[in-house]
Amino acid sequence: MTELELLGPRASGQPLGTAILKAVAEDFQVDEVLDIPLSGQGEHLWLWVEKRDLNTEEAARRLARAAGVPVRSISYAGLKDRQALTRQWFSLHLPGKADPDLSRAEDATLRVLKQVRHQRKLQRGAHSANGFTLRLTALAADHAALDARLQTLKQQGVPNYFGGQRFGHGGGNVQDAQHWAARKALPEQRNVRSRLLSAARSYLFNQVLAARVADGSWQRAQVGDLLAFTDSRSFFSAGEQECSDPRLAILDLHPTGPMWGEGPSPAAGAALTLETAIGQQHALLCQWLANAGMSHERRILRLPIGGLTWHYPEPDILQLEFVLPAGCFATVVVRELVDLVPAGQTDSPCVF
């Protein structure tokens, strides 16, 4: 499956050139944003961890081994990219135990930067956002055109597609999900089941968003749309009055698309017509998600880019810094700028 099939059309027009992302881990840096005050006491030890070219699950296993606890005793808010330099929180459940020596978990790929006690464990999805520092190298694009495009993205956001990494190489996760859906069965392995259900829901959401990008309605509320605020999981129906809510214009409020599950879409009007049509095109996949017990949820169609800044450390390097809500993909921001080509190596440092 191609990127266009998995995501959909760009909203900003043709890419302005080409670049490399992730030539080295430092080119893709992620800092988890967690708005939880830690008490300094309790049976949970929270760890602020920096990892390089290491996925979250492997980091959790290493920390658990070093602490001498089962991996189920360690928690994290979300999964971060492997091919990156990331900083995120973990928590270890250590009732009645002293702080363990975690040095055995540390090497060039993992460092524990801070540890603090707290009364509660870290819950999945507890982080409010992720901060990104991206370095695009081997840049072949006009700076003036990039500056103008970036200014537009800052003002109007980008389509909130799920990024290609959600779907596996060539869309393999979607194809596997379709295979299981045709059999009306679920994988026995929990992690495989979770990955394929997530890929299927993400693919269907992208199909709806792609249609709305194509007709220009992805950032415009229509009567019958379900609207949501950037950081809220709740939503409400749009009537004539809601469609002119000034919070839409300042990127606080957005139309949403479906995260498929049990029951019909609660949307109405043109949104319901579109979502029903997409559901009929992928009936087996939708029924598979419903049978798996997934509940119908909503996701904003438009992704506001918080605190977007950029500069050029070298003529052929563009460095971007911005913040995105949890669960959103930095690569869909880059996609509106340039085409990415396979990674090579560069010697230019990342400037902060």
UniProtKB/Swiss-Prot annotation:
Catalytic activity: uridine(13) in tRNA = pseudouridine(13) in tRNA
One function term, GO molecular function aspect: RNA binding
InterPro entries (alphabetical): PsdUridine_synth_cat_dom_sf, PsdUridine_synth_TruD, PsdUridine_synth_TruD_CS, PsdUridine_synth_TruD_insert, TruD_catalytic, TruD_insert_sf, TruD_pseudoU_synthase
Active site as annotated: D81
Record's keyword terms, sorted: Isomerase, tRNA processing
Annotated ranges, domain TRUD: 157-303
EC supergroup of this enzyme: isomerase
Domain of life: Bacteria
Pfam families named among the record's database cross-references: TruD (PF01142)
Regions that span the bilayer: none
Record's GO cellular component terms: cytosol
Gene3D superfamilies given in the database record: TruD, catalytic domain, TruD, insertion domain
GO biological process terms, semicolon-separated: tRNA pseudouridine synthesis
PANTHER family xrefs: TRNA PSEUDOURIDINE SYNTHASE D
Family listed: Belongs to the pseudouridine synthase TruD family.
Protein's UniProt name: tRNA pseudouridine synthase D
Encoding gene, per UniProt annotation: truD
